[in-house]
Amino acid sequence: MVDLRYGSGNIFDEKVHEIGIIALGSFLENHGSALPIDTDAKIASYIALNVSIITGAKFLGVVIPSTEYSYVKHGIHDSIEDVITYIKYLIENGRKIGINKFLIVNCHGGNTIILDELSKLNFDDCFIQMESVCLTHAATEEVSLGYAVGILSEDKMKTHNPKIYEEIGMVGLKEAREKNEAIDLEAKSVEKNGVFLDKTHGKSLLNDLITNYVEIVRNMI
């Protein structure tokens, strides 16, 4: 048996090796013209990996399936069961390398509907916590955050408009607005204020999010 040096490297504490970080977003979802279709997965992965590097917790990768409310039609999504099955796979393999606490960094609002099923995976010797970043879809905050991460095309901001791309702010998603008051309120805000790139806010937001998740890991030790 090899004697592993758990105290090596830049880590918070040796116990951080018991914590695994999982990114959760979406891969197939329209985000206007300036952001890619896998925006949520890339932002979640960026945050999760950076938190792993800062704390020493293990980055376990990104969940490929994603889910969504049935009335939100701006991409291709999977069932809740598909998402849970993939997470279970990561957890089962994470436990084989000594992980018993899992932090899921979720950056897709539709994935919040897995929470009830996800809670069933918690046991005395296995703790799972999902913390979500839910921004107005493809609007100012997500555009600015995308810039900070490095996935935004500034040139394409010229056409990044809800009048052209209905999913921006979900302004043109009539059924979603009718069935979800929160979505409708966000859409009205986008209609009123528009969408613009705020580079300073994007960098600040990214830094704050990473810092917040680092604190969550610290509290899990």
UniProtKB/Swiss-Prot annotation:
One of its GO terms (molecular function) is ferrous iron binding. Fe cation 1 binds at residues 29, 40, 108. The keyword ATP-binding does not apply. The keyword Nucleotide-binding does not apply. Its cofactor is Fe(2+); Zn(2+). Disulfide bonds: none annotated. Pathway: Cofactor biosynthesis; coenzyme F420 biosynthesis; Cofactor biosynthesis; riboflavin biosynthesis. Keywords: Hydrolase, Iron, Metal-binding, Zinc. Fe cation 2 binds at residues 31, 40. Requires one Fe(2+) ion for activity. Requires an additional second metal ion that could be Fe(2+) or Zn(2+). Its EC number is 3.5.1.102. It catalyses: 2-amino-5-formylamino-6-(5-phospho-D-ribosylamino)pyrimidin-4(3H)-one + H2O = 2,5-diamino-6-(1-D-ribosylamino)pyrimidin-4(3H)-one 5'-phosphate + formate + H(+). Belongs to the creatininase superfamily. FAPy deformylase family. Catalyzes the hydrolysis of the formamide of 2-amino-5-formylamino-6-ribosylamino-4(3H)-pyrimidinone 5'-monophosphate (FAPy) to form 2,5-diamino-6-ribosylamino-4(3H)-pyrimidinone 5'-phosphate (APy). Homodimer. PANTHER family: 2-AMINO-5-FORMYLAMINO-6-RIBOSYLAMINOPYRIMIDIN-4(3H)-ONE 5'-MONOPHOSPHATE DEFORMYLASE (PTHR35005:SF1), 3-DEHYDRO-SCYLLO-INOSOSE HYDROLASE (PTHR35005). This is 2-amino-5-formylamino-6-ribosylaminopyrimidin-4(3H)-one 5'-monophosphate deformylase. It comes from Methanococcus maripaludis (strain C6 / ATCC BAA-1332). The gene is arfB.
